[in-house]
Amino acid sequence: MRHIVKERNLENKIQIFSKATSNYNIGNPPHSGTQKILTKYKIDFSNIYSEQLTKQDLTDCDYIIVMDDSNMNDVLKMNPSKKVYKLTDFIENCEHTYIPDPYYTRNFDLTYELVSKGCNSLLEHIIKEHNL
């Protein structure tokens, strides 16, 4: 999402934070399979490390975007809010109700495709919603 926001020259208007609901990989860079797909699409991940989601994040952010129902439940337990969405909510006519975790599926291409579509649609929503 950061690279899309940067391409659209909106980095001064939109901040992106990527946070984890579990503490399993805190401080680690993206999975090697994720690194390969990001490299394939020339997306810089050099400053991306897993960080823990906090209650303060839920207060500070305008949108909380999750990948699946498990993440949704974790976030809602921390702070029930109407600003929590699954990324697939923004993909028109999406067959998937969640973003499959490539750690388990090993299908990094499908996950990238869905995340890319979702991020582009989410950005269009934000631009329209906030008159950017």
Predicted regions, residues:
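Phosphate-binding/catalytic loops
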Residues: 63, 69-132
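Residue-level recognition of conserved beta-strand positions in structured domain cores
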Residues: 18, 67-68
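Conserved active-site segments centered on acidic
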Residues: 1-59, 124-132
